[in-house]
Amino acid sequence: GELLRTLKAGISNNKIVFSGVGKTSEELEYAIKKDILQINVESLDELKLIIKISKKLKKKVNLGLRINPNIDAKTHSKITTGTKNDKFGLDIETAEKIYKNYNNNPNIKILGLSIHIGSQITNINPFVRAFSKITNFIKKLNKNKIIIKNLDLGGGIGVRYNNERTISISSYAKNILSISKKLKCNIILE
């Protein structure tokens, strides 16, 4: 898959984040063996599978939790990924429970959060709302002595195929800089 191709292309394993729904046991085992930067967890079932594999391999694995911020990106229904009706990611309440119940698990280290609200997004407002929600969640975790090292901000800026209006890169960057000033974590962009 993509992970193997990325490594074959010469990308350093400590720069690779493995994301996406439907990761197989074999893919997860390969990612854990390769000591990549982090695996973004989509569900509680996937978390349990990762723990089982890391226990078998006797390796501690770095994880990020993919948060579904319940933000409508106002894009085509087939490419939106950030509302509660979408199958992607964990709601904030579930993520809080995972931190409470799994943060001291010897097989994993939860060091990141991830969001991805959709593709072909042509308005900055959904990003602003999603980034605000994830920032508030990180601040809440920090108050509980949970430190987030990596924040993976996903979602696709709309491409101009004809004369469609889209988001300016400078506007997007301004919002990310605002987050990075408020939080003490690495910002990862996909």
Task: Describe the function of each predicted region.
Residues 1-150, 175:
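Active-site-proximal beta-alpha core segment in soluble small-molecule metabolic enzymes
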